[in-house]
Amino acid sequence: MSSLRFRVVEKAFQTKAREFSIPEERPSEYFGKYVFNREKMFKYLPGDVFAKLVDVIDNGAALDSGIADEVASGMKRWAMELGATHYTHWFQPLTEGTAEKHDAFVEHNGKGGMMEEFSGKLLVQQEPDASSFPNGGIRNTFEARGYSAWDPSSPVFVVDDTLCIPTIFISYTGESLDYKTPLLKALRAMNKAAVDVCHYFDPSVKKVFSYLGWEQEYFLVDEGLYAARPDLLLTGRTLMGHEASKNQQLEDHYFGAIPIRVAAFMKDLEIQALELGIPVKTRHNEVAPNQFELAPIYEECNLAVDHNMLIMSLMRKVARAHGFRVLLHEKPFKGINGSGKHNNWSLGTDNGIALMAPGKTAEENLRFITFIVNTLMAVYRHNGLLKASIMSATNAHRLGANEAPPAIISSFLGTQLSQVLDHLEVSTDEDMGVLVGKHGMKLDIPQIPELLIDNTDRNRTSPFAFTGNRFEFRAVGSEANCASAMIALNTAMAEQLTDFKRDVDEAMSDDVSKETAILQVLRRYIKTCKPIRFDGNGYSEEWKAEAARRGLDCETSCPVIFDNYLSESSVRMFTSTGVMTKVELEARNEVKWETYTKKIQIEARVLGDLAMNHIVPVATHYQSMLINNVYRLKELFDASEAEGMSAENISLIREIAERTAYIKKHVDDMVEARKVANRIDNVREKAIAYHDTIAPMLEQIRYHIDKLELIVDDQMWTLPKYRELLFIR
C-alpha cells in the first residue's frame, strides 16, 4: 500500500493541465445555450402559449393545463436539436443532493416502429418512489407513491443528452419531501408581507423578490491521491493526518496566482456553467492551500438555489475530467480553514428598488431602515432556528473554529448604521418627525449616503453581517443546499413583516401620522432586538459569555440544535405563513437526526477499519524493525555501549506499543458504544448518543494515529500525507 502512495504522488507531479475546447463566441453569446429561456420560448412556442407561460413565471398565475402539450412539444423540439434523447424530473430531496430518473423520448408508434414523444402530462407530473428517499416516516415501502411537479419559474435545461425539468417533490398526501416546495412557499409568503409594507412608501410596488448570491468554496485534490485515502473516498474528509509543516501560516495562498491545472479546470467549469445559464463571475484562491472559490452574479432566490445545486454537480464532473476530485465537505482537513458558502441575501421590488440599500431622500431612508430593523427582528426572534437551518454533522466541524463564524447567530451592522439605530432608539417622537421632514438632520448626517456600501467595515467573525446593500449569511456550509437557510430566513422575514404591518396599523390614528407610527414601532423594535447586534470579535470567549447573558441560543450540540425546528415559535411561524405543517417539520427533523447519526456512524466504521487494517499493522511492522535493530546492537557491542545506542529506539518502541494499544482499546470501545447507541429507538436520543459518546472517540483515536505518523518511517506510511494532498497541484 505504501508503494501505491508513492506511485500516485509521482503521477500527480507528472500530470499536466488538460486541454479542452474553448468556444469562439464571447461568453455573452453562448450564455444560456443549453437553457430553455425566454428567447427559446419565443422561438419554439406559439405566441399565445408564450404569453400565458410568461404570465405563469412572472406573476404566479396558475398553469393552464391546455397549454402543457404545446409547451412540452416546443421543449422537445429544442432539446432534440441539441442532441437530447431523454428527459428527467430534476428535484432536490432531503439528501442535500439532487435526484433524477432518465426516460427516453421514444415510444411505440403503433406500426412496429418508434417515434419521439413528450406530452404535457409527462412535463407537468411524474411519480417517483417517495419511500426510497429520506421522508421522516411520511412514506413507507407499502405506501410509496410520491409526485414530482414542474416548477415553471426555474427554466429547464439540457445536460449531455437529457432534458432536465426542475420540479418539486411531494408525498401522495401532499407533504413536501424536498427543499424546493417550502422554499417556493417561503418566497411567496415573504413577497406578500413585503409588498404590504412597501405600500407604506410606494403603492405601485406589485412584487418583492428575494435575491441570493452564493459564494462556493471548495478544495481540489489530485484524483490519484484521493483514491489512496479511503477516508476521503468514503466520508469526504480526512479522519486522520498530521498537519503539514507548512499550511496557511504564510498567508500566501489567498488571492495568489492560480495553479495551471486548477486554472484549466476553472475555465472549463465556467464555460459549461455559462452555457447552462449560471452567471459565474468570480474565481480565486482561498485561504487554505488547494482551496478555491467560485461566485456568480446574484439571482432570484429560487433560481440561485437551483444553480448552486447544478454547479456542485457540474464541479464534480469537470473535476474528474481534469484529474481532480472536488471536496465540498466543510472541513476536509484538520488544522487549516474549512469551506463555507456565504449566502448574500437581499430584497428588491419589481420596479427596481433595492430595499436593503440606503436612498437619497428621507422617505427612501425610512424605508431602508424599516427593512433593516425588521430583518434584525426576524433574526433575533429566530436566531436558534437560523442556526439549525445551517447546522449539520459536517458544518459543525467548521463553525466556531476561529476560521468561520461562531455557532451563535448575531448580526454585524458596522459603525455608521449602528449609530443611526442608536440615535433612533433614544429619539423622541418630535425628533423622529424631524427626521422624516428634514432629511435626517437630527441624525447628524444629512442622509445615509450611498457610499455606505464602502463605509461598512467587514467583520469576518459575524455569521450574519450587513455589507452595504445586503446581509451576508456566512454560517452556511459549503456542502449544504442553500434552500435550508433561505427557507428559514425568508419565512422569518415574512412573519416579521406581517407583524410590523399590524403594529403600524394599530399605532396609526387621527393624531398619529403613518410616518410617526412607523418610527414609533421601529424604535420599539430597535430596543427589542438589540441583543442580536454585535460588532466585536465573535471568536472570543467573552462573546460566548455575553451572548448567553443576552439570551441568544448558545447550544453547540448538533442534534439538540435541531430542536429549534419544533419550538413553539418555529412551528407557529411556519404554520401561520403556510410554509410547512407541523407534520412536515417533524418529518424533516427526523431526517436531520437520522442523517447526523449515519454520518458519524460511517466515520466511526471507516476510522476503525483504517486504524486496525492500515495504521496499527504499519506501526507494529516498524516497531519490529526497531526491535530487531536493538537486538543487533546488543550482539555487536558491549552492554553499556549498546544501551546508549539503542535508548532512542527503545523509547520509540515503547511509544508505539502504548499508542497502538490505546488505538486498539478505543476502537473496541467505539464499536461497543455504537452497539449501545444503535439499540436506542428514539432517533433524537440516538443522534445525541452519537454526538456525546462516539464523535469524541473519533478525535481521541485520531490523536494517537497522528502521533504515530510522525514516528513511523515515511517510506512505510501507506496513506498520502497532508503535504502531498495539499501542495501537489
Question: What spans do the regions from the language model cover?
Answer:
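Active-site proximal loops enriched in glycine and acidic residues that flank catalytic Cys/His/Asp
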Residues: I67, F91, S119, P296-Y298, ...
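N-terminal hydrophobic targeting/anchoring segments and the immediately downstream early-domain regions
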Residues: M1-E24, T141-F157, T162
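Active-site-proximal loop/turn and secondary-structure-junction residues that shape catalytic pockets
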Residues: I67-V71, F91-P93, K121-L122, F169, ...
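Histidine/acidic residue-rich metal-binding segments in metalloenzymes
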Residues: F13-S119, V124-N140
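Glycine-rich, acidic/polar active-site loops that bind/position phosphate-bearing ligands
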Residues: E143-L328, N337-G340, L347-E590
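Hydrophobic/aromatic-rich, well-ordered segments within soluble, folded domains that form packed cores
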Residues: A84, T88-F91, H307-R320, L347, ...
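Short linear, low-complexity motifs centered on an aromatic residue
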Residues: E96-G113, A130-S131, R229, G236-T238, ...
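C-terminal amphipathic alpha-helical interaction region
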Residues: I518, Y525-R729
